A protein has these predicted regions:
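Conserved cytosolic headpiece of P-type ATPases
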Residues: 1-733, 741-742, 755, 769-770, ...
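A loop-to-helix transmembrane entry motif
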Residues: 777-787
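Hydrophobic alpha-helical transmembrane segments and their immediately adjacent juxtamembrane loops
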Residues: 736-750
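Long hydrophobic segments that form regular secondary structure
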Residues: 766-767, 771-775
Length: 875
């Protein structure tokens, strides 16, 4: 049925009108989100709090280097800074390039328009306001506009409202007053699922609805990531501790030496002043050394390396991470706000159940095949099935396909005499065919069950039985469809509407159709809930449908009440104070609009929640952008993907649970690295400080510490970052944002092990100092090597910190650690053998190497014994 405006003939715009319209209203292109320049992307890496502390240390080191004309230490510190920032920049830049390939926007898609009275195809980007566009089934609407003609037109608005099927018409009598957008309007980015129409373009590019949402999605969220907050606190702590100890050391030692010098010497000429300057400079250098030793130069690079390695490995689990911090932030999330269509469900209508007359399988098959305008697309094995046309009709064809029936063969063999397409007014579709199966002319009808049953010969008992079944389906938020047929005499009318109106049809049964939940979703939701993560469904669907989906995935429980669900309109009516009181209790928000979802995210954040948002539509973009982690779908719109941090390539909620596991495991690995790293810094700092009190030469130089803090720690970070994630972390509750990254157990380990190492090293230092020949470069080389080897063996203990596992329990884990350990050991041998003046070392004989390696290995064995005792205690 066609609905026309008063215009009987549409000629479209002339060439001159097209040019004028483009000048006045702009082009049909969405302004892409402003991407930071390459330099800005790189400079962002200097916002890392530990990098900033390093920069301060580098400035002090540079001052000393200029005075002494020895630049090795300063170069080392700057190398540390540029290496850490460079790695972070490279991996984010690389991810952005991959993302751009994934998100190629089809602005060249051809669109059929009427211009100069002729039908022609032009690229989507060339559409202008005033253009007359012809819309056919399966096509995407290229701009916003008003319909001037609509024939059985149905539109998939899920990218904007979450609605899969919206009826469109130009007949005011059939306008849907509750629709999000007027019934005679169509929006850019939506898809024609059934029928066809003609529209007049009213808005293009950024002026379209999709353009407005895209603009809101580029507003930057000011939320700091949980890891960033913790690293800032850690950097402040290290910075304050390092600078305080350095300042006190400088004041105490300078005061002592100056007092001793000035009590015996009278300052009369510049020679004495030069000696005073030498004393001040000597202890200023010591203070700078203490700062450099206190600051873990390798920490930012190691964290970056851990994040970067996780980015790569998460890609294998269908998580394309675009923003590096998102790897870890996923481990801290406390709430997931997810849309329904395509994330929890398969975004493919399917027959849930068929109550049909099983004695008539051939008639049912022919009726479904012939009385349909939909098509199934050819797919390779294993690929998700899909079709073109009405989603309900596609569901019936898929059901038929599953029965081993070839719908195309049946459709081609049944000669269509007449067809009455579905309309919202009639609520049925009818097709008259010459049936090769029955060798008769048959009228097939399908539509709303109550309409179809009204045309059939059914008694009250049969109608009551079907109505009871229909009510059960509708309570589960399913669509229902009835089918019937009638044999038509050859000399009868071939007007479908007239034949249906006569009644007397035979009812063949009912179908219950739904967009089924993904099979892995209930388990994934359960995992998230056991991990202490709240799941909230935010959808444009009806309250009934949204609640039913929540029930099916295990989110909605029998004890839940109206307090646990709300509609978008009701939510918008609440004040911020009222909404804040309810947000944590909400499980379902239905009829939600884009701004409702964004407001929900921001209110949850005000309550202290760390929020992840999933979405595939343009309507999800503002919320995706404001959440701590935005998760878009691989098949989602370009606007949604641009606003997100992670793209789920398989569109599955299950991948979110996997990402949480990765994030939590990554945080534990970073904590393990901090245990390893800070043990080194505590030992080094106190060694230098106590060495000064004992009156020895600086036991560790800045260049030696840069080797330990940079190169050795980089390999250690790689080893710890490569530890496989464990499902055990999903049994824990999310960490609180206020919890410091260094836990009491970590603090005890750092100072317990550190003080043990310090006692050994100080004993060694005192022994060397009291030798008759005194302490020389050989002794300092032995001291440096023992210091490194103690940390070397402690790396193995750090890799299983937080567990009672033996390092040898997992062969692949032990092998990975061993390969890194060999690299570190070879590096230490090379530095000792060839470091010379730069590293203040000299080569050691083989027997000393064996004594040092064997003697320091007690660190590993004590760790193994301690974990073994704890395992026995837990039995």
């Amino acid at each position: 049925m066609s609905q026309n405006t008063n215009e009987s003939h549409l000629t479209g715009l002339t060439d001159q009108e097209v040019i004028a319209s483009r000048e006045k209203n702009g082009v049909n292109l969405l302004t892409p989100p402003k991407r930071p320049s390459i330099w800005k992307l790189y400079l962002e890496k200097f916002q890392d709090p530990v990098i900033r502390v390093l920069l301060v240390a580098a400035v002090f080191s540079l001052i000393i280097s200029i005075i002494e004309n020895e630049y090795a230490e300063t170069i080392g510190i700057f190398f540390a800074i540029f290496l850490a920032t460079g790695i972070g920049f490279y991996f984010e830049y690389d991810a952005n390039k991959k993302f751009d390939l994934l998100n190629a926007v089809g602005e060249e898609t051809p669109v059929t328009v009427i211009r100069n009275g002729k039908i022609k195809e032009i690229p989507r980007k060339d559409i202008v306001v005033g253009d007359i566009v012809i819309l056919n089934t399966g096509e995407e609407v290229p701009a916003d506009g008003m319909l001037v003609e609509a024939v059985s037109l149905q539109v998939n608005e899920s990218t904007l409202t979450g609605e899969l099927m919206v009826n469109k018409t130009t007949d005011e009598a059939h306008f849907d007053e509750e629709a999000t957008y007027p019934s005679n309007s169509v929006m850019r980015g939506t898809t024609i699922t059934d029928g066809h129409g003609i529209m007049r373009v009213e808005r293009v590019g950024d002026a379209t609805e999709i353009g407005k949402v895209a603009r809101q999605s580029t507003e930057q969220s000011q939320e700091q990531t949980p890891l960033n907050i913790q690293l800032t606190k850690l950097a402040n702590l290290i910075g304050k501790a390092g600078f305080t100890i350095a300042a006190l050391t400088f004041i105490i030692f300078t005061s002592k030496d100056l007092y001793q010098y000035l009590t015996v010497t009278e300052v009369t000429d510049w020679h004495q002043w030069l000696e005073i300057a030498r004393i001040v400079l000597k202890y200023f250098m010591m203070a700078v050394t203490l700062i450099v030793v206190a600051v873990p130069e390798g920490l930012p690079m190691s964290v970056t390396l851990s994040l970067a390695l996780n980015m790569r490995r998460m890609l294998k689990t269908n998580n394309l991470v675009r923003k590096m911090h998102a790897c870890e932030t996923m481990g801290a999330i406390t709430v997931i706000c997810t849309d329904k269509t395509g994330t929890l469900t398969q975004n493919l209508m399917q027959v849930y159940e068929a109550q049909v007359d099983e004695s008539q399988p051939e008639l049912i098959a022919e009726g479904i095949a012939a009385n349909s305008t939909a098509f199934l697309e050819e797919k390779v094995e294993g690929e998700k099935p899909s079709g073109v046309g009405n989603p309900t009709e596609i569901a019936l064809l898929l059901w038929l396909n599953g029965k081993g029936q070839n719908y195309m063969k049946l459709r081609e063999e049944a000669k269509v005499i007449n067809q009455l397409t579905f309309s919202t007014e009639r609520k049925y579709m009818a097709t008259l065919v010459d049936s090769p199966i029955q060798k008769k002319r048959i009228l097939y009808i399908k539509g709303a069950p109550e309409i179809v049953m009204g045309k059939c010969n059914l008694d009250k008992a049969q109608i009551d039985k079907y109505n009871e079944q229909l009510l059960a389906y509708q309570n589960k938020a399913m669509r229902t469809l009835g089918i019937a047929y009638k044999v038509i005499p050859e000399n009868a009318s071939d007007d479908c509407a007239e034949l249906v109106g006569e009644g007397g049809m035979t009812f063949l049964g009912i179908f219950a159709i739904s967009d089924p939940i993904r099979p892995d979703v209930p388990d994934a939701v359960k995992k998230c809930q056991s991990a202490g993560i709240g799941v909230k469904i935010v959808t444009g669907d009806t309250p009934g449908t949204a609640t039913e989906i929540a029930r099916q995935i295990g989110l909605w429980q029998p004890e839940d009440t109206e307090r646990n669900r709300i509609t978008g309109v009701e939510f918008a009516a609440l004040s911020d104070e009222e909404a804040l009181e309810r947000v944590l209790d909400l499980k379902v928000m239905s009829r939600a609009r884009p701004m409702d979802k964004q407001r929900l995210v921001q209110l949850l954040q005000q309550k202290g929640a760390v929020v992840a948002v999933t979405g595939d539509g343009t309507n999800d973009a503002p919320a995706l952008n404001h959440a701590q982690v935005g998760l878009s779908m691989g098949t989602g719109t370009s606007v949604a993907k641009e606003a997100s941090d992670i793209t789920l390539l398989d569109d599955s909620f299950h991948s979110i649970a996997t990402a949480v596991m990765w994030g939590r495991s990554l945080y534990k690995n970073i904590q393990r690295f901090i245990v390893f790293q800070l043990t080194i810094n505590v030992v080094a700092l106190l060694s230098v400080l106590l060495g000064a009190f004992f009156g020895t030469a600086l036991p560790l130089t800045v260049t030696q510490m840069l080797w330990v803090n940079l190169i050795m720690d980089t390999f250690a970070a790689m080893a710890l970052a490569s530890i496989s994630p464990s499902m055990d972390v999903m049994n824990e509750k999310p960490r609180r944002r206020t919890d410091f990254i260094i836990t009491p157990a970590m603090r005890n380990n750092i100072f317990g092990v550190g003080l043990g190492f310090l006692a050994i090293l100080m004993g060694l230092l005192v022994y060397f100092k009291n030798l008759p020949s005194g302490m020389d470069t050989h002794h300092l080389t032995v001291f440096f090597t023992i210091f490194v080897m103690l940390q070397f063996w402690n790396l193995f203990n750090a890799s299983v910190f937080g567990t009672n596992h033996s390092i040898f329990k997992d062969a692949s884990h032990a092998l990975g650690m061993l390969s890194v350990a060999i690299i570190i050991l070879v590096g230490q041998i090379l530095i000792v053998s060839f470091g010379g003046k730069v590293f203040r070392t000299e080569p050691l004989p083989l027997n000393e190497w064996l004594y040092i390696i064997g003697g320091t290995s007690f660190v590993l064995w004590i760790g193994e014994i301690w974990r073994g005792i704890k395992r026995l205690g837990n039995k």
